[in-house]
Amino acid sequence: MQIKALSVSEVNQYMKRILGSDPILSHIYVKGEISNYRLHSSGHMYFTLKDKNSKISCVMFKGNCEKLKFFPEEGMSLVCKGYVSIYEKDGQVQLYVNDMEPSGIGALHLAFQQLKDRLNKEGLFDTKYKQEIPLIPRRIALITSPTGAAIRDMVSIILRRFPQVELCIFPVLVQGEGAVETIVKAIELCNRYPGIDLAIVGRGGGSIEELWAFNEEKVARAIFNSRVPIISAVGHETDFTISDFVADLRAATPSSAAELAVPNRVELREYIDSMEKRMIHLMKTKLNTSYQKLSFIENSYFFRYPLNPIYDKQQYINDLLQKIKSAINVKKQFNHRHLKYLGERLHSLSPLSIFSRGYSIVRNSEGSIVKSTDHVQVDERLCIDVIDGEINCKVIECKKEEKILGKY
């Protein structure tokens, strides 16, 4: 009997039918560590799931990827739900993943931590971006479910504490499909609505799945971008959501948010009365101090004799002028005496002053001063300068004598 040969395509198609009809492989959970993770531009996810002995190729299509609450990462331990089949084109056996969860920790808890870390790094939780909650808001927006207990509690508490405030209710879905979109739209509408001073975004308690809308990135960014200050009031005191971290103020419960949003009317009245009394006391103290200062000024020397300081300054200026004149006279007298002394010194050092003491100067015919008998000859004509003129004479005889130093 001749056995019919099958084509490669037929073999792969047969194997695919076998795998698809297997009750275990058609609906299976596989645990392993993710590696070779790659998110394709088409939106499909490709990776390998492995343990210490084996590995299997995995694919997760775009539609299923978009349902994930967390981002798979290289080396993460996962439990993948799906079915085993064969890729006919190359005959490769693959695990087609429909859903996955981190091993040992819930997907929602991991998604919460991943988003929290990412937004924190971006600075969305930074206190420098927190807006101040108004002390007495005139109009408050309540963004919550219109039918839950939270809205009844908030309205009751706010109107009891401060009935003058105006409440604007923006009804939204707080859980399930469409909740994120309605919350984001309500926050955006609240920012366009005129006169809104404050908004409370929240709901009552519930499981993490029921509170999850307030952990979504779109809601967090809408709260961060709001120009209206927002109080986050989600769940009970032990519940924390991403909205709590990004809001301008976190309240443990919706009831607490209502108390934080408005002051107590009675307490506010008491506070205003006490401030009024304190202000009156301060004003009286200030007036008394001012009266005392005014009285002191009225009795002061300057106030009673306002021109005396001017007279004192005038006398001071006159004294200075006298001192200046006296100093100038003293300087003039000193300079006069000094000048006279210098003149006398100059006169005593003048060559002409020797004539007054009986001396004369002898010059030869060339006008040179004769200092020695060696400088003249017999019959040479000389000119003798005296105090009142000159004498012309003729040398008859030259006698040389040795003079003793200091004789004359």
Curated annotation (Swiss-Prot):
It catalyses: Exonucleolytic cleavage in either 5'- to 3'- or 3'- to 5'-direction to yield nucleoside 5'-phosphates. It comes from Alkaliphilus oremlandii (strain OhILAs). This is Exodeoxyribonuclease 7 large subunit. One of its GO terms (cellular component) is cytoplasm. It is found in: Cytoplasm. Bidirectionally degrades single-stranded DNA into large acid-insoluble oligonucleotides, which are then degraded further into small acid-soluble oligonucleotides. Heterooligomer composed of large and small subunits. GO terms for molecular function: exodeoxyribonuclease VII activity; nucleic acid binding. Pfam families: Exonuc_VII_L, tRNA_anti_2. It comes from the Bacteria. Its main location: cytoplasm. Belongs to the XseA family. GO terms for biological process: DNA catabolic process. Its EC number is 3.1.11.6. The gene is xseA. Keywords: Cytoplasm, Exonuclease, Hydrolase, Nuclease. CDD domains: ExoVII_LU_OBF.
